[in-house]
Amino acid sequence: MEETLVFVDEGFLARLSKYFGNGKYIKFDKISFIKNIAKKKDLFVKHTFYATAPPFQGTPPSEDEKKRKEGYDKFKNKFSNRKDFTFLEGRVQRTKNKEGIFQYRQKGVDTVMTMALSSFRADYPTIKKIILIACDTDFCPILEMLKSKGIEIILASYYERKRNTEFSRSHHLIDCSSEYIKLTKEDFLNFKLEK
């Protein structure tokens, strides 16, 4: 099997699992999920780059924030000894909206993913195909650059034609890719973890 690298936007993956779980996150084996996406294209995962952000921590952190951080650290530690898995970390920003309600947004996650996409050839010069699990059109410039250098981009994402839905994004990211795999609920359920 030909080797590939997989680049994962965890924020997108989490939103999609919640969407397919009808408002509840589907807990699933991420490594098996990623390997299965590659297997659909007869590819072997050489390395995964997983872009995420640790949960927001106030000063001092609340009990809920501490609990979220413990869960994140436990999740991250599961992968810390794997040589085929790299965490790319941004941060979470907390702001208040006009109604005084806190809102949380990931910051820098797309940037660290773009950095990894732009530099992987130094460590993996023989890779000719990569898989991107994301939905953000901000990745189009780097994808276009990679395609111009002979890299095939396989986008694994979810897109709906219905306007004003959570996944009714621009078709532009699909157009920037070489191939498109539409993720399904079954992709998650096939690797569902029991509590």
Range-by-range predicted roles:
Residues 1-105, 152, 159-162:
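Domain-level signal for Mg2+-assisted phosphodiester chemistry and nucleotide/NA-binding surfaces
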Residues 86-195:
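Nuclease catalytic cores that cleave nucleic-acid phosphodiester bonds
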